[in-house]
Each structure stands twice: as C-alpha cells, then as structure tokens.
C-alpha cells in the first residue's frame, strides 16, 4: 500500500529508513507555511540519532510529539509527591490501580530506568544506553522488575487509559 503520511515512533523510523521505506519530505509547500523550521534543534538532534545508511532522519521524518512516556495520575488518590518517581508504580498502596502502556519500549524502558536510577543520577549510564541494552542481564532485570510490578497492574492499555482512569478503575497510567 502507498501512504502519504505515517506516524511511526522513533525506533520504527530507524527501521523504515534501514529498509528504504521512507521518501524524503517534499518541502515545496507552496502557500502552506513550512513548520519544519520551528522544530527544536535539540529534538532534531534526537531524531537524527536514528539516521542510518547515509540518510539523515529529519529529512524523512518530522518529530511531532516528544516525551510521551510519563506518569498520568489521579490527584484524588495519588499525591503529587508520589507521582514524581517511577518507583510509584511499584508502591503496593496502588495494588491493582496501575495501567501499564502496552508498549514494549515504554515498559522495558521504565523497568530499566527504575533499576538503574542511582547509576543514571550519578551519570554512569544514559537513558539511550539503557533503552538499547538487550543483553541477557538487561532482559533478566526487566523480567524481574515487571514481575514485581504485576500485583499493581490493573491492565495493559494503548488508547483507553484516560477513560479507565476517569471511571476510577485505575489511579496511575
């Protein structure tokens, strides 16, 4: 199938570039404003980290959203101070009240970031290094952390989290 526009995540952009599935963005917008110049240089640098085979990612993809992995919480049930750390997800007082993203990278990253929080704070490791660590040790850590998290999980979701939270079935997402 041919598509004019797709909305893949950054790691899928990398795969699509590698498999030659993307065309360069046609910047001849005519009278339509060119918003590409308004993208933060920092974000362009981050998307360009996925460049490969001589293709610069920002010539093929426009970052339209940034920082989608965070903690959504119901302030009636979760104090703001609790929601400031990934550790809240493992807190037993939220047993059965957590919705986890049905996203491999979000779950994997959350588990590794929590496990390595002290090393991250000390500058011994970076988030990109953790996110790209698929060693047996990293996988074992993620498995252990997700198993520890299991009692708190109400369900796994991709799109219905806000609705479930407004019904009071979950307090964290």
What role is predicted for each listed range?
Residues 10-12, 21, 30, 75-77, ...:
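Solvent-exposed coil/turn segments that connect beta secondary-structure elements
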Residues 14-66, 80-87:
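Hinge/lid segment of periplasmic solute-binding proteins
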Residues 97-100, 107, 111-173:
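Ligand-binding pocket segment of bilobal, Venus flytrap-like solute-binding proteins
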Residues 1-19:
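Early extracytoplasmic/lumenal segment of secretory-pathway proteins
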Residues 77-84, 116-122:
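Short helix-loop capping/hinge motifs at secondary-structure junctions, enriched
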Residues 1, 13, 86, 161-164:
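Short, hydrophobic alpha-helical packing/hinge segments within bilobed ligand-binding/sensory domains
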Residues 68-80:
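Hydrophobic/proline-rich hinge and linker segments of small-molecule sensing/allosteric domains
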Residues 8, 57, 66-68, 95:
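Extracytoplasmic
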């Amino acid at each position: 199938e041919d598509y004019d526009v797709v909305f893949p995540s950054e790691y899928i952009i990398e795969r699509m570039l590698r498999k030659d599935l993307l065309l360069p963005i046609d910047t001849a917008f005519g009278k339509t404003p060119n918003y590409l110049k308004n993208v933060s240089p920092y974000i362009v640098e981050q998307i360009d980290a996925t460049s490969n085979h001589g293709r610069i990612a920002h010539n093929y993809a426009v970052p339209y959203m940034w920082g989608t992995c965070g903690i959504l919480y119901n302030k009636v049930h979760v104090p703001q101070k609790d929601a400031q750390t990934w550790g809240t997800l493992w807190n037993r007082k939220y047993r059965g009240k957590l919705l986890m993203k049905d996203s491999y990278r979000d779950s994997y990253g959350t588990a590794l970031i929590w496990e390595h929080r002290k090393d991250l704070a000390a500058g011994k490791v970076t988030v990109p290094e953790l996110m790209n660590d698929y060693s047996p040790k990293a996988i074992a850590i993620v498995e252990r952390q997700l198993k520890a998290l299991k009692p708190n999980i109400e369900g796994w979701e991709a799109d219905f989290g806000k609705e479930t939270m407004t019904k009071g079935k979950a307090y964290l997402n």
